[in-house]
Amino acid sequence: MLVSYRWLGEYVDLTGITAKELAERITKSGIEVERVEALDRGMKGVVIGHVLECEPHPNADKLRKCLVDLGEDEPVQIICGAPNVAKGQKVAVAKVGAVLPGNFKIKRAKLRGEESNGMICSLQELGVETKVVPKEYADGIFVFPSDAPIGADAIEWLGLHDEVLELSLTPNRADCLSMIGVAYEVAAILGRDVKLPEAAVKENSEHVHEYISVRVEAPEDNPLYAGRIVKNVRIGPSPLWMQARLMAAGIRPHNNVVDITNYILLEYGQPLHAFDYDRLGSKEIVVRRAKAGETIITLDDVERKLTEEHLVITNGREPVALAGVMGGANSEVRDDTTTVFIEAAYFTSPVIRQAVKDHGLRSEASTRFEKGIDPARTKEALERAAALMSEYAGGEVVGGIVEASVWRQDSVVVTVTLERINGVLGTAMSKEEVAAILSNLQFPFTEDNGTFTIHVPSRRRDIAIEEDIIEEVARLYGYDRLPATLPVAEAKPGGLTPYQAKRRRVRRYLEGAGLFQAITYSLTSPDKATRFALETAEPIRLALPMSEERSVLRQSLIPHLLEAASYNRARQVENVALYEIGSVYLSKGEHVQPAENERLAGVLTGLWHAHLWQGEKKAADFYVAKGILDGLFDLFGLAARIEYKPAKRADLHPGRTAEIALGGKVIGFVGQLHPAVQKEYDLKETYVFELALTDLLNAESEAIRYEPIPRFPSVVRDIALVVDENVEAGALKQAIEEAGKPLVKDVSLFDVYKGDRLPDGKKSLAFSLRYYDPERTLTDEEVAAVHERVLAAVEKQFGAVLRG
């Protein structure tokens, strides 16, 4: 928001405070002033001159030789290259010795043999940005009104002896998107009164209903619509002081009618739109949602396709404006306009925001509607605009306002106690001090025994709860005056929760095992969201995703780890071992908070042991991945309760995948990627695992039992059992352990064989069995008896026979 210091002074007394001092006070109150800029930029010696004569330069086709009266004894000759310079004009002249922006000094000179004693200036040469210069003067010099006094200070007449404060407003302070709103803020800071502009309208004897009617078919989008008719207007330039204020605020002047609507926008923060009444094509205004397939050509001459999500102003048949955003070319004010319909409305933020997004049209008006205006001042702004059009466009205001409204002013009442204010701020303010601050803010209130009941003005949409009032009191009291105190509390050393400590042990173990930690996106694409997931649910979609690739929340960590492995392999890093600890997100139904579960996942591809001087290279395989997990389970005393069960999972190799169960509950899986998936990610043989980390770390560990060092020798027997190919080694091992109790202490698989020496559909599993009794030395007969019992048990359960 650009705020003219001189213009602001019309609403609040700024005596005794400079623009820079005011900027500092505003910043201290919580609204940042990014810069203070002097519009005159140090210029001096620029006066209003009268072009007495203007003739072609004898030696240059594009130059003019002008005789200019500067209000001095004799007129001076000035050579000018502007295409629009002409006899009789009042122009800005930089005299010899004048200083223009950039410390450019004007000197007497000869141009193509003719003497030039000064410079006739364009607005750009006086420091005005091209984008705000009126179009008729964009490529030439500026021409003053005919009543401008010769020899007067041109900078003063152009309103450039002013300073502009640029406010950086947070979204909650939409009230300061107007000069009056800023005036209320400054008045509160300085403890002064606000002087509001007069909006008295002189009406004729006619009534507006003879000209037009209004019907709103979408009151939820447009709670308030009002309008006035001004007839017999004469389109022309607006007064110079108004043009100067518009340009200082970054708005290009057009004509008196359009400039007045923009002036009210800046003054009240209320967007207005002026229609050429005779071009509306009917005597009614209908506000409704657009119909599918409708189009409108807006003021920028672009045809825009409309949908049912857009709000339009129509003449009962076709759109004449995209509500709150831009008017239509079919009803714009032109040089021959004589009757104007002024629209003042309150459009709700969502419908305006949708139109801005769909059409890429953001304007000063739409910005204010998006952030919220004060509907209580809508008709006041309309009256002010009608009064100005009567004064500066020669218009005749038709009696009455046409209106359609369902808006009702809801008074926001907030109660807060003095004790609460002082308790939050750490101050010792009195009731009188708080009352003075609320009075400066112009918040109506009552006070009863230290309890303040505040009726929040409609302009302050950001005030709703007691904390908002406390913040306002703190701002005006002065943040720099709040006492600085150290917290009064017992200092205690920090620490980790048991769960956090376990998670840290997991990281240390995996990194010690040779894996590197990865951190990947929580967002993924819909087609990858449920791949590899332990549990699946309807993917949770973002309301406004940046792209489809990052539009839903993940349900597994593996897809992004595979992308990381593929990324590394594409850059010649063939051996990859990564793990990630992160959250996955599962929908629990509509209006229910989604579940956020922590997972541990890993990916292994390439060599596990590479370039070992003492041994051969070893590729990552199923047993490497399983061994890493076994070590993790053993770390937390869970190994005895873990079971690996063959499983078939989508995207994994059907014969090299196992589900992992803890106490009968599946908590994860480990396996090789399906060859098709390996090809999809451009990976060689790759192994992955994923665990429900929360279940793992919350599981109760087995108590560690002391066993003395063996005093007696153990006996080791090896057996090779021929079984069907579908028999699981784990199941066979468990049967051996059960049948061999209590003497069989350890069973380990050391060989698997399939080949020509075995019948079709058979395989050989070789186990090593260790027999031991802590109380005595076992005899061969005792071991043989138990060994026979083991063989009988596996034969009965699995049809296993000793391999010959």
UniProtKB/Swiss-Prot annotation:
One Pfam family cited in the UniProt record for this chain: B5
Signal peptide feature range: none
Positions annotated to bind Mg(2+): D462, D468, E471, E472
Molecular function GO terms recorded: ATP binding; catalytic activity, acting on a protein; magnesium ion binding; phenylalanine-tRNA ligase activity; transferase activity; tRNA binding
SUPFAM superfamilies cross-referenced by the UniProt entry: Anticodon-binding domain of PheRS (SSF54991), Class II aaRS and biotin synthetases (SSF55681), Nucleic acid-binding proteins (SSF50249), PheT/TilS domain (SSF56037), Putative DNA-binding domain (SSF46955)
GO cellular component: phenylalanine-tRNA ligase complex
GO biological process: phenylalanyl-tRNA aminoacylation
FDX-ACB domain sequence ranges: 710-803
Cell location: Cytoplasm
Annotated CDD domains: PheRS_beta_core, tRNA_bind_bactPheRS
Enzyme Commission code: 6.1.1.20
Reactions catalysed according to its record: tRNA(Phe) + L-phenylalanine + ATP = L-phenylalanyl-tRNA(Phe) + AMP + diphosphate + H(+)
SMART domains per record: B3_4, B5, FDX-ACB
The keyword tRNA-binding belongs to this UniProt entry's keyword annotation: yes
UniProt keyword annotations, A-Z: Aminoacyl-tRNA synthetase, ATP-binding, Cytoplasm, Ligase, Magnesium, Metal-binding, Nucleotide-binding, Protein biosynthesis, RNA-binding, tRNA-binding
Keyword Cytoplasm listed: yes
Domain B5: from-to ranges: 409-484
Reported cofactor(s): Mg(2+)
Cofactor: how and how many bound: Binds 2 magnesium ions per tetramer.
Top enzyme category: ligase
Family annotation (InterPro entries): aa-tRNA-synth_II/BPL/LPL, B3/B4_tRNA-bd, DNA-bd_dom_put_sf, Fdx_antiC-bd, Fdx_antiC-bd_sf, NA-bd_OB-fold, Phe-tRNA-ligase_IIc_bsu, Phe-tRNA-ligase_IIc_bsu_bact
Family, as annotated: Belongs to the phenylalanyl-tRNA synthetase beta subunit family. Type 1 subfamily.
Known partners and oligomeric status: Tetramer of two alpha and two beta subunits.
Protein's name in the database: Phenylalanine--tRNA ligase beta subunit
